[in-house]
């Protein structure tokens, strides 16, 4: 049996070139030529994360990448790249035109141009053959006129005349005509608004031969031209620059700390919803907080700057000196902080022992006691004088200007009236006086009223003892309505007693009620 041999197919580039037109290429051929195999996809995916350029990883030809293979240890060679560029023909530089030298002018010469007498020869016109009337033809002489222009030497004024040069044959006359000055141009620049494009209008003025007119030039500062060429730009610096610097605020304490960490730690430990906030004004919180918790003797020289624990017997329950510190079993050391108003706050964290289990564990709420210290006002600044002798200062003291004169007669006290000034300020003293009753008759009887024993009267004696009582007057403001400012409470019942009368006044309740009898008919 004859074995069948497998024929090798054509190369991949040839197969792709033939099947590309028909569009029926094999997947492996198409993916290999278009670099879309699995290896190419992995290379693109990994190349977006790490750099794999220049390694030649792919399904292409094994040429070692774009640079080829180099033997190990051999230096890499640098291949020349790029094309040589020849310089072009240099461009002519822009600049001023060539300056034509001008003849020097002698300052000693006169500025007046002398006039010369020119002789004009007679020109004879030869008419040729003489013919009759109507047959004679006049032929004028041909005159050649040539002008030469020299921009420097040919300078003519307002009164210049043409120069006539005649030859020897007196047949040809040459006129040397001077060039006419160009007409004067007036340049006027006008703009319309800040953003409008300026327009240049040139006005030509007509001048006569040998005359000149003034040149009027109007310059507008808003019109800007184009600068041709390189100009050096020099940066300008201010003569007296302002120095900028930052001022750092000095620390308020000798050992500054991080404000953020301190605020977070304080808020986490003292200011949370599980801690009761109690402000107190008990000064014992600053030095010895045990005085506000329990009764007892303590050493005043002992400074308790540590956490204190108080143990109590439940059978001997005693009230705390301060009600806010009741049932406190533990109180911490003092902590100093600063409030929003800038005051110093002394804080202590305590714990109450309100509940005790059978095992002996005490449970209670955490309490934050804080005391805000008052601010210390700054003392008034006192201007101190310089010690020793010094010059440059002079003080003028006028006692009449600085002192104030008060005349009590011209300016009386408005609080005292004339009637009050007549009153005797001395108090009367009747401690050693005797009551003497005299009468011109014998057997005269005097009736001295007595106070009933049932009346509760309070008698005020002005001269009690030998001391001096000073009474300060009080002013009471009465409004316009006539009512006093203090609340008025009437005294009920009111008991009236007149000690100077000789009769009694019965109360209406003491009278017997009379019954009205009606007669029946």
Curated annotation (Swiss-Prot):
Q: Where is this motif: Nuclear localization signal?
A: 1-10, 512-518
Q: Which GO terms describe its biological process?
A: microtubule-dependent intracellular transport of viral material towards nucleus; symbiont entry into host cell; viral penetration into host nucleus
Q: What subcellular locations does the record give?
A: Virion; Host nucleus; Host early endosome; Host Golgi apparatus
Tell me which InterPro entries the record gives: Late_L2
Any one Pfam family here would be Late_protein_L2
- Record-level Gene Ontology MF annotations: DNA binding; structural molecule activity
**Which pairs are disulfide-linked?**
19-25
Quote the cellular component terms of the Gene Ontology held in the record.
host cell; host cell endosome; host cell Golgi apparatus; host cell nucleus; viral capsid
Q: Does the keyword DNA-binding apply?
A: yes
UniProt keywords (A-Z) are: Capsid protein, Cytoplasmic inwards viral transport, Disulfide bond, DNA-binding, Host endosome, Host Golgi apparatus, Host nucleus, Host-virus interaction, Late protein, Microtubular inwards viral transport, Phosphoprotein, Viral penetration into host nucleus, Virion, Virus entry into host cell
PTM summary = Highly phosphorylated.
Q: What does this protein do?
A: Minor protein of the capsid that localizes along the inner surface of the virion, within the central cavities beneath the L1 pentamers. Plays a role in capsid stabilization through interaction with the major capsid protein L1. Once the virion enters the host cell, L2 escorts the genomic DNA into the nucleus by promoting escape from the endosomal compartments and traffic through the host Golgi network.
Outline the subunit composition: Interacts with major capsid protein L1. Interacts with E2; this interaction inhibits E2 transcriptional activity but not the DNA replication function E2. Interacts with host GADD45GIP1. Interacts with host HSPA8; this interaction is required for L2 nuclear translocation. Interacts with host importins KPNB2 and KPNB3. Forms a complex with importin alpha2-beta1 heterodimers via interaction with the importin alpha2 adapter. Interacts with host DYNLT1; this interaction is essential for virus intracellular transport during entry.
So what family is this one in? Belongs to the papillomaviridae L2 protein family.
Q: Which HAMAP family match?
A: PPV_L2
Q: What is this protein called?
A: Minor capsid protein L2
Q: Species name for this entry? A: Human papillomavirus 4
């Amino acid at each position: 049996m004859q074995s069948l041999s497998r024929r090798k197919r054509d190369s991949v580039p040839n197969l792709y070139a033939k099947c590309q037109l028909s569009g029926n290429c094999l997947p492996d051929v198409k993916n290999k030529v278009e670099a879309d195999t699995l290896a190419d996809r992995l290379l693109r995916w990994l190349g977006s994360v790490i750099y794999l350029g220049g390694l030649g990883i792919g399904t292409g030809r094994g040429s070692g990448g774009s640079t080829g293979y180099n033997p190990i240890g051999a230096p890499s060679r640098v291949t020349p790249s790029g094309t040589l560029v020849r310089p072009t023909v240099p461009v002519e530089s822009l600049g001023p035109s060539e300056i034509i030298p001008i003849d020097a002018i002698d300052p000693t010469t006169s500025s007046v141009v002398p006039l010369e007498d020119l002789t004009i020869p007679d020109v004879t016109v030869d008419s040729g053959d003489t013919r009759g009337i109507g047959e004679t033809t006049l032929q004028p002489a041909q005159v050649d006129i040539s002008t030469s222009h020299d921009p420097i030497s040919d300078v003519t004024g307002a009164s210049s005349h043409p120069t006539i040069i005649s030859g020897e044959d007196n047949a040809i006359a040459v006129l040397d005509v001077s060039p006419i000055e160009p007409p004067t141009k007036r340049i006027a620049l006008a703009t319309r608004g800040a953003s409008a494009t300026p327009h240049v209008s040139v006005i030509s003025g007509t001048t006569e031969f040998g005359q000149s007119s003034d040149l009027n030039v109007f310059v507008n500062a808003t019109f800007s031209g184009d600068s041709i060429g390189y100009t050096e730009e020099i940066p300008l610096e201010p003569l007296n620059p302002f120095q900028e610097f930052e001022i750092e605020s000095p620390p308020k304490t000798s050992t500054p700390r991080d404000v953020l960490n301190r605020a977070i730690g304080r808020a986490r430990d003292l200011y949370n919803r599980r801690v009761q906030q109690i402000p107190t004004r008990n000064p014992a919180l600053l030095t010895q907080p045990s005085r506000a918790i329990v009764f007892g003797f303590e050493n005043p020289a002992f400074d308790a700057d540590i956490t204190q624990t108080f143990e109590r017997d439940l059978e001997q329950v005693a009230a705390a000196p301060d009600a806010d510190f009741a049932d406190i079993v533990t109180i911490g050391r003092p902590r100093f902080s600063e409030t929003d108003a800038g005051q110093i706050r002394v804080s202590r964290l305590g714990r109450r022992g309100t509940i005790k289990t059978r095992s002996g564990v005490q449970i209670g709420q955490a309490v934050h006691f804080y005391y805000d210290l008052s601010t210390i006002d700054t003392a008034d600044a006192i201007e101190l004088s310089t010690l020793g002798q010094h010059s440059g200062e002079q003080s003028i003291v006028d006692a009449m200007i600085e002192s104030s004169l008060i005349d009590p007669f011209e300016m009386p006290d408005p609080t005292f009236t004339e009637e009050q000034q007549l009153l005797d300020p001395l108090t009367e003293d009747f401690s050693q006086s005797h009551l003497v009753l005299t009468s011109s008759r014998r057997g005269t009887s005097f009736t001295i009223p007595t106070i009933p024993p049932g009346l509760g009267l309070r008698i005020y004696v002005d001269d009690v003892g030998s001391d001096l009582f000073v009474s300060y007057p009080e002013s009471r403001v009465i409004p316009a309505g006539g009512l006093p400012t203090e609340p008025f409470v009437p005294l009920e019942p009111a008991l009236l007693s007149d000690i100077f009368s000789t009769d009694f006044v019965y109360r209406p309740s003491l009278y017997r009620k009379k019954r009205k009898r009606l007669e029946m008919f």
